[in-house]
Each structure stands twice: as C-alpha cells, then as structure tokens.
C-alpha cells in the first residue's frame, strides 16, 4: 500500500509538506491561524511591534477547566454511543515490525544488560527486544532519511524499546519523563501506519488521533509530525480551544491523516459534525496523567467511545497513578508496557537542586543575586523559568524585574491566547530569557534548553515540585533548580528532604531542622495547600496582566541589566 500515493484527487497526499495553516508555521515562526506567520500587518509586527488579532480568551479565569481553553461543562452529551459491528468494519493493517537480524541474534543476557544500562523495565506478554541503532528499528527509507537528517546519534531509551512495541501493532503503555524522546516514539510508527492504510475519501476523518492536555503540547507534537511526515505528504491539523474554530474546521473538511487535539475542542467538533473518528485506527494519549489531573477523564472516555475497538492505542505518561492504570485497563487490550527510570516519585538526577530557607521579604533580593550570577555576560544562552504560586505574584514579579532592567515576561491563565503564544516564542528564541509562570500555565510547555528553574513560591506538594524542576535537565542535559522555602512551607519540609536525599543533593541545615520538627506533609498528593498570597507585595502598578498585551508584560525595560 505504501507506494500508492499518487498526486491528484482528494486522496492524493499532495499539498504543502505535511500541515495546514492552522498551527505552527516552522518557516515563519508564527501561528498563522492567529496572526500572520511572517509577522505581517495583522499579526505580531516584526521588530517589536504590538499585536493584532483577538484570539478568544480562556473563559472563567484560567483554563476554563484545563486544556488550553476547553470548556468542561456537559461536553460530549450530544455524542451518540456507537454499537460496533466488527464483522462489518473494513480490515486494516497495524503490524509492521520485522526484527533486524542483529536484534534477533542478541542473547537474553545481552538484552537484559542493555535494558539495565538504560533503566528500561518492560511488562506484558511477548515484549519485543529493544533496538540499539536507528537502522535496527526497520523504518522505511522515507522515515529514516528524515531521522538521520536531524543528526541524532542514537535512539533514546524510550525509543529503543518503544519503537518495536509500537510497530508491532500492540497496545502500548510508556512511562517516561518529559524530554525523553517519547513524541518520536509514537510519531514515526504513526507515519508508517498511515502509509499502509487506504487513502482518505471525502467525508473521512483522520487515521491517527493524538490527544494532549494543552494547546502548547499539541502544537509541539504537530511540529514533530510535520517535520517527519513531510516526505510522505501527510496532512495534519491541531484542534484546540481559545482560538477561532474556522481554520480548524477548514483543515478537517479538506481531510487530514493526523489530528492532534485537546479533548474539549475535539468533542465540540464531533458534536457539531465537523469531523468524525470512524477512520481512526491509531490512537495516542499523550501526558495521560496530566489530562486526568486537569479533569478530562469523562471527555477522554467519550472520545474513545467513538473509535473502533480494534484500533491500536498508545498511552504515554510521566507517572503511573491508579487513575491512569484504570484508564489503561478499560481501553487497552493485552497491552505491553515500558517504564524508563524509577516509578517512585523522584527528581531527575541530572538536576542540581538548591533549596534556600528564606523569609518572604528576602525573596526579591535573593532572586536578583541569582539572576546576576546566571545571566552574567551578554553572550550566555541561559534561560530561566520562574514559578510563582499565584497569577498576581507572577505579574508582580514580572513588573519588578522589568523595572529593574531584566527582560522578563509572564504567562498565566488570565492571558489571552495570542499573548501566551507571543511570550512563549520570546522565551524559546531567547529574546526574553526569563519567563515567570504559574503551574497551570506551564503544563505541556516543552521548551528546550531551559538551564535554570527558580521556585519563587514553593508549590503545594512534592509532585508539583518535581514536575516544576523537571522543566530543566531534559533530553540528557544538566540543569539547576533553585527553590525558596519559607517557614510557611514547613509542613512540606520532610517530604522535600526525602526528594533531595534520594537525588543525593546537599541539604540546608535549617531545612533539615524544619523536617525534624514539622510533622508529616500529608503524603504525595495532600499536605499543606499553600498560602494563596505569597510573594512580593510591593505596590508598583495595578493588578494583573489582563487579557491582551498589557500589565506587567507591556512595561518598558528600565536601564537594561542584560
């Protein structure tokens, strides 16, 4: 089948190199359904001009329940329950893996050693052996050429084990930290899967559906699938809330092989008849734990109910809590599982963790001292992500830093979508190497090369602490996490000390003393629920940053420090 993609007609995979205008324009560096992809007159004007274009807000303060502006109430009530007659469904191909002779000849002892050396654990029946090189994975030439062009030296651990699992057509669970290379672990087999299926006919929905918790993650996935699906002319679109529906609807009506979506907006499209999931035979749930954290479980269940039961399903998660296990048990069949690293709550050991016990009034001065050290020299490429406990503190700190000459911008749920996109782009490109964020706004953001995380306010629990500091030290790099810890946080001292000890980090004696006298922290998800306020209270300027470019992000830099 893979040779059957001629030009012409609806089914032909012609068109501009994998991807419609809705989503990230890699050449122009913009989101062309929201503003001009080359910074034109109706977008982010070049050279620092302001923004045009509206872009729907988040509704209801923050995420409207999660996932980039998706509304949560009564979603999916209009979807009809499907009764599948399996005998009437067209057959499809999902098993493509042919073991390379080098892999077949490896002894069980050699396989065990490779897995142990790379912290790979596998579970399930007849799990295929891992591959050690790209050539051993057995991808077709059109995929391998794209991979080699990227200059990767070897597959990551999750790719070594995950590719044979995914290509075999089995249902797969993969547990690995963000930044481990999991996106390519499911994207490349997805391309092979698509090229083995009949071409789309008018009215057909996608063949591959990828669900993600946030629009930021969805766009990042789209960038990968566009890059590697280019030679196959595979079309894709990104479907997420917080932006106009028109461009997304146009993409779906023209036909796309891949749909990357947040759950709420996808259900909206399904209920309004703009697409259907009858052709989906390859389903991916990315960051499943985050989707459940954000309250998407009912929507995920409704969406999966619209997809044929004999599909291939791949679920990816950074953690493996009971809720994720239940979802896997309900929707995956005889699945095989790969875990990378420990399943215990643990921090990435490549991250240097510095925890300083401070008073609330000391935080600003300490932050400036760290910034002076981190940002020393104009040539350095450091990027710093600063976490705060509330949106108001995020704006306060951003305002304070900009008035002190630091190129900081803030991102949180009260910002409109186009401002969030712009801030993220400024941070990614290094034009603004300091980004201040709240926990919710940061979910799903995968910015490479963040060198430092600074926890201005300590989060509500150890799991959030580990997720925060995990923004640095990705994909094999080293990172540094600096955390301000006050006596108000003392109930969490014992749990934090445990995380630091596990990662063999130095512990501030005052923190150790707090841990001895503080009592329990309420377990992994419980414990102290935060102060609510916190952070700098200095009375410069008004409230938050508002819904367009304004507030703290609009302040000019005074006497630029960097």
Swiss-Prot record:
Keyword Glycoprotein on entry: no
Gene3D superfamilies with a match to the protein in the record: P-loop containing nucleotide triphosphate hydrolases
Family under the similarity heading: Belongs to the DEAD box helicase family. DDX5/DBP2 subfamily.
GO biological process: alternative mRNA splicing, via spliceosome; nuclear-transcribed mRNA catabolic process, nonsense-mediated decay; rRNA processing
Residues that bind ATP: 176-183
EC number: 3.6.4.13
Domain remark from Swiss-Prot or TrEMBL: The Q motif is unique to and characteristic of the DEAD box family of RNA helicases and controls ATP binding and hydrolysis.
Region (RNA-binding RGG-box): 526-548
UniProt catalytic activity: ATP + H2O = ADP + phosphate + H(+)
PANTHER family: ATP-DEPENDENT RNA HELICASE DBP3
Motif interval(s): Q motif: 132-160
CDD domains: DEADc_DDX5_DDX17, SF2_C_DEAD
Cystines in this chain: none
Residues in Helicase ATP-binding domain copies: 163-338
Region (Disordered): 536-562
Domain (Helicase C-terminal): residue spans on this chain: 370-515
Biased composition regions of type Gly residues, renumbered to the chain: 536-550
Signal peptide annotation: none
Protein name, as recorded: ATP-dependent RNA helicase dbp2
GO molecular function annotation: ATP binding; ATP hydrolysis activity; mRNA binding; RNA helicase activity
